[in-house]
Amino acid sequence: MALNVVILAAGKGTRMRSDLPKVLHPIAHKSMVQHVIDTAHSIGSDAIQLVYGYGADKLQASLGEQQLNWVLQAEQLGTGHAVAQASPYIADNDTVLILYGDVPLIQASTLEALLAARPENGVAILTVNLANPTGYGRIVREQGKVVGIIEQKDANPEQLLINEINTGIMAVPGKQLKTWLSRLSNNNAQGEYYLTDIIAMAHADGVAIDTAQPQSAIEVEGANNRVQLAQLERAYQAREAEKLMLAGANLRDPHRIDIRGEVTVGMDVMIDINVIFEGKVILGNNVTIGAGAILIDCEIADGAEIKPYSIIEGAKLGVAASAGPFARLRPGAELKQDAHIGNFVEVKKAIIGVGSKAGHLAYLGDAIIGDGVNIGAGTITCNYDGANKHLTVIEDNVFVGSDTQLVAPVTIGKGATLGAGSTITRDVGENELVITRVKQKHLLDWKRPVKIKK
């Protein structure tokens, strides 16, 4: 029996006050609907039907080439009408799981529990008990068994007292679903085709109906405006921060961290406030991340330290290496064991050898730097000739004086010393001292020009 997931994502989201389709608004740098798609894949879905309408071009541009079947809902006539558009793509023996593109925090474990709760050839509904159920459809039971769902606007005073609400998420057998969808009517206060009406049909047909509930109600909350979107963002961040702490990270303040990707941490990791993680980030044991740092698609080995306000993107730090404060490591940067990149140093597509240091105010691009090298302040690898990038090689134990320019392609041999202020345009041999600065001149009794008053 195949698992066929239908994701409803056709709405405009007028209350967002945006040209962007509602489901494309982001949670943690990823659209709400992408969160739902990823969760659907994670539970082993065999097919995903994405029901779309408003903003089709933007949806397709955002979601790109994924394993999705695009199903158009030209008119938004209710949830039942939306699911009905996917009927041609549903086999009789499918288990159909219905999800919503604006409910991004639903967890795989909850959906697995819902599927497990579905009786054979029956229906399972995800429900939540709320202290204030206003605005939601109510679960109607008789002698404990579900017999229907009544929408808020159609409920009588007695039904309005029910606090078990419908989340809209349900698992339904394919053959019966298609039959029930064909029998839906829009004879209700909204004039819409309610998906929820199939529950009363299931009861009337003698089909077993069971329910499951999420671990937290926040999983099934949607975002209809930017206030609710921000609330979901904070809930997501709190959940991700908790995962990090349980995995061995110490967060100075769990409320001041942004996780916008996949973060893996070792033991005894220390993360200060206002740190942002994006993409895939791996932190080893005893790693320290300073306040305000931004880490994007990088790997930080045991004992390494990222000091405050550094940006680490597409880079690797070896054991006990350090960067910052205010350092920038760009894609292709790699710091070997005990290497140090200090404040206002930028490294791009360069390897910094074991124990090598660039303490401050330098640019190291397209370079291979050996072990035990000292890079003075103001050093620049001049890697670009206006058309192509060229490589600078600095071998082991080289001392580069401050304010040195290395015009690539160039190689500096082992143990060489480059005097401060030099511009190096040719290869330097091992253990050589090279100084290229202009000879200092002294003009005695020099008189400065005098300003002329206007």
From Swiss-Prot:
Region called N-acetyltransferase, residue ranges: 248-454
Instruction: Write out the similarity annotation.
Output: In the N-terminal section; belongs to the N-acetylglucosamine-1-phosphate uridyltransferase family. In the C-terminal section; belongs to the transferase hexapeptide repeat family.
Subunit details for this protein?
Homotrimer.
GO CC list: cytoplasm; membrane
Recorded protein name is Bifunctional protein GlmU
Q: Which SUPFAM superfamilies match?
A: Nucleotide-diphospho-sugar transferases, Trimeric LpxA-like enzymes
| Underlying gene | glmU
Active site: residue positions = 360
Q: Which residues bind Mg(2+)?
A: 102, 224
Instruction: Indicate the segments annotated as coiled coil, or none if absent.
Output: none
Q: Which InterPro entries match?
A: Bifunctional_GlmU, GlmU-like, GlmU_C_LbH, Hexapep, Hexapep_transf_CS, MobA-like_NTP_Trfase, Nucleotide-diphossugar_trans, Trimer_LpxA-like_sf
Species in which this protein is naturally found: Shewanella sp. (strain W3-18-1)
Q: In which pathway does it act?
A: Nucleotide-sugar biosynthesis; UDP-N-acetyl-alpha-D-glucosamine biosynthesis; N-acetyl-alpha-D-glucosamine 1-phosphate from alpha-D-glucosamine 6-phosphate (route II): step 2/2; Nucleotide-sugar biosynthesis; UDP-N-acetyl-alpha-D-glucosamine biosynthesis; UDP-N-acetyl-alpha-D-glucosamine from N-acetyl-alpha-D-glucosamine 1-phosphate: step 1/1; Bacterial outer membrane biogenesis; LPS lipid A biosynthesis
Note the HAMAP family from the entry. GlmU
The subcellular localization recorded is:
Cytoplasm
Catalyzed chemical reaction(s): alpha-D-glucosamine 1-phosphate + acetyl-CoA = N-acetyl-alpha-D-glucosamine 1-phosphate + CoA + H(+); N-acetyl-alpha-D-glucosamine 1-phosphate + UTP + H(+) = UDP-N-acetyl-alpha-D-glucosamine + diphosphate
